[in-house]
Amino acid sequence: PPSLFSFVVCSIDEEKFAALSRTIATRFAGMPHEVIRIPDAASLCEGYNRGFARSRGDAVVYCHDDIDLLAPDAAPRLARHLTHPDFVGVAGATRVTGPAVFWAGHPWLHGWVTYHAPGDADYEVTAMSLDAPLVTEVAALDGVFVACRRDAAAAVPYDEATFDGFHLYDLDVSYRAHRAGFRLAVACDLGIVHESKGDFGAEWSRYAARFRTKFPELSAAQGSPHFYAARVPTAADVLATQRRLAEIAAGQGRRIPARTP
């Protein structure tokens, strides 16, 4: 397992950062870790590159500040998942055809992410597919949570010149990593919860145009990025629902083994 996990977080929100720090301290209590906060990032790319330069870990985790990890053993699970892949996210696609991680649509989308904004009565448990617990041969990762080996992160820095805002940073870096021959995977068993589903407004469109300019060959029509969801009242119900999904996936022989080097 990694000897040190370095979490790099761009956060201007004291409350969110404090909550995330508590989550990391709890889940990674048995593993050496550090949390590097960038409170004044010019962009996510700039902040992540600056945070990486300050980090010391042989495993680096880039994540948003509005997440939770419900699985009690999320840390050892993540450590196991990093045995073979170079990058491990929680949602992604095995095919890239346009300016969004999930642009290709099904059947290429994977990941189990739960959504729960402050004040929500219920948790929305979603599943992109029944491939679990680790999906390999991935070509792009959503940036909500991405863990990677240090050498891989060093080889593929974030493009802060092109993506000088808060959109497309994740698709760009993960797709370049995939094209460079690094191994990407999606972990479905960390119990991740995210407060936000993302914003695809005018700012996203501006950076989508930059992505199209950088990768003109990715010009396919958008596929269907639908997902399936169940609303449950508690965090315990989230984990119970995901355990049931895992049982169904295993029963259908849908477990995708990690690829050996």
PLM regions and their residue ranges:
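Short, well-formed alpha-helical segments that are part of the catalytic scaffolds
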Residues: 1, 13-29
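Glycine-rich, basic loop-to-helix element that forms the pyrophosphate-binding segment
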Residues: 41-55
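Conserved nucleotide-sugar donor-binding
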Residues: 56-57, 142-156
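Short aromatic/hydrophobic "clamp" motif used to bind/position activated sugar donors
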Residues: 60
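Conserved donor NDP-sugar-binding/catalytic core segment of glycosyltransferases
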Residues: 68, 72-112
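A recurrent flexible, glycine/aromatic-enriched loop bordering the glycosyltransferase active site
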Residues: 123-148
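Donor nucleotide-sugar recognition loop
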Residues: 140, 154-178, 182-193
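Active-site donor/metal-binding and catalytic loop motifs
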Residues: 185-205, 210
